[in-house]
Amino acid sequence: MAHFALVGPPDARRPRLGRPVGGSRTSAVGGVVLLLPDGEPMSGRRASLRAHAAMLPLGRALERAGRSEGLAAHVVRYRARGWNGTDADLAADASWAVTEAVRRYGDVPVCLAGHGLGGRAALRAAGQEAVGAVLALAPWLPEDDVAAEPEPVRQLVGRRVLLVHGTNDARTDPELSFRFAERAKKANRDTCRFEVHSDGHALRQYAAEVRALAADFVLGSLFARPVARPLTDAMAAPPPLGLRMPLAVGFGSARRR
């Protein structure tokens, strides 16, 4: 078994929201999306600048799509990049970010949107009262272990939940996110999952479609905007259909014109 040495205590640093994606806002904020970058299972190293930068294109796309409703997007800066076992540091930082967003903007709906281990953090921190929606992209979820408690799902009750996973992801197992979605669907019917055929962990091959789906989901969840038929069908379909919904090539292209 590999052993990991933490470099400096995560608690010596503080998580941060920083400036909103797209610059300072001049209009009223009607909702917030908190973007949670990928991380590492065990590490005390400073949060990755590369992982932070990887969330910016999605943040910009969501901010543009939700500008008329006053959507603010922030990429959360973790104390450190590691989940770190039962400490679940990334989830703790995500919970802090929700509290900070409410302090900063008032009583507005919040969506947690994470990638990789940030996806796990988004799902875990969903129990915060202000959270109305959770988007988990290629989420890193643990293997089933009879000696450990399964990844919790009760905190998702009352939230709208979307998981998106590439079928060729070599870093995080898409089958584990499917199993998680199965359990989550039993606790919370407003759960669905899309599969991106032949795409990998970074979801680069169909990035435009993934961003369009994310915008549809976030704006529909936070502001009750009408959403595309595939998303409606996925939410309504029983397992496994609504948990293995294929993301069609060109999804959202008509809206992008």
Each model region followed by its residue ranges:
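Gly/Ala-rich beta-loop-alpha elbow adjacent to hydrolase catalytic centers
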Residues: A113-A122
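A conserved short beta-strand
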Residues: A130-P142
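Acidic catalytic loop of the alpha/beta-hydrolase fold
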Residues: P142-E143, G166-D173
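C-terminal catalytic histidine-bearing segment of alpha/beta-hydrolase fold enzymes
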Residues: R189-R257
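Short beta-strand/loop motif that positions the catalytic acidic residue
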Residues: L156-V157, L162-D169
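Alpha/beta-hydrolase active-site loop
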Residues: N84-R104
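Short, surface-exposed "cap/lid" segments of acyl-processing enzymes
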Residues: A2-S68
